[in-house]
Amino acid sequence: MKKRIWKIVSAALCMIMVMSQTVFADSIMGGEKEYVSLGADLSQKEKETVLKLLDIDNLEDYDVEYITNKQEHEYLDEYLSKSVIGSRALSSVRVKEGGDGIEVKTYNISFCTEGMYRNALATAGMENAQVTVAGPFNISGTAALVGAMKAYESMTGEKVSEENLDAANQELVVTGQVAESIGEEEAEQLMALVKEKVVSRGAESVEDIETIIDESANELNIKLSDEDRARIEELMQKISDLDLDIDQLKEQAKDIYNKLESMGIKFNEGFFTKLKNWFLSLFDFLR
């Protein structure tokens, strides 16, 4: 009996090793080239300021895209007033392949925190990347998500789902709005927790999502206004329609989820976590 189990385990481990080697080889072939998205309306002086903040000496060494104000309005008009978005594209982003999950740094960004970007970028589908967001002076930074994902598309050669990008933009805006009422860190944690529960439970109905929002707010000792609750509910309706991998989501925004776990929050296990735990249990049995 144990011999047969060992054969199954050996075969499974071989398959995992082959898959890991393939991914590793792909990462070597892909290299670690860096990509930049610049606001198309930056003046020369503003551009110099942004490049300095992004730690870029020679722009020719990078794959560069320019994000227009028209693109910013296309993605954000549904969630922000035109006056907030403005008439100039200024947000600029540098993206480097590699790292452990999504790592974010910001400069001159007043509305969006690093955690908010990390949460939203994970929703959009970004994986294992180092992201730096900068403005020439204090700006909201809400449009930077568009630039980050456009740079990510260039880096991976894969088109980002419009549905995921739309949900991520709404998530960034809603988290920022909720933060004005309950605080930045609290908003980051609440959004991450609600999203995890919605995705892991496969919640789709308004009633189920509202229950999750209330449950999560209670766990974090947060009191939500009716307006903020409605904003989150509308966003989660959209997120529930996306094909998000809960393991990947938690891996990419691990700083937030690790903090929640340290606070005593327990999460449902995703497929790969269950698989890992199954192997561990099996090895314990075979000892």
Locations of regions flagged by a protein language model:
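Catalytic cores of large soluble enzymes that bind and process phosphate-bearing ligands
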Residues: 39-42, 109, 140, 186, ...
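Charged, long alpha-helical assembly modules
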Residues: 222-287
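Sec-dependent N-terminal signal peptides of Gram-positive bacterial secreted proteins and lipoproteins
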Residues: 2-25, 279-282, 286
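Soluble oligomerization/assembly scaffold segments of membrane-associated complexes
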Residues: 122, 127-222
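Long, contiguous ectodomains of secretory-pathway proteins
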Residues: 110-113, 159, 179-184, 202, ...
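N-terminal, leucine/charged-rich tether regions that mediate assembly and partner docking
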Residues: 25-130, 154
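Stable alpha-helical elements in mature extracytoplasmic
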Residues: 46, 50, 113, 117, ...
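Anaerobic metallocofactor- and corrinoid-dependent redox/one-carbon enzyme cores
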Residues: 31, 51-52, 209-212, 216-221, ...
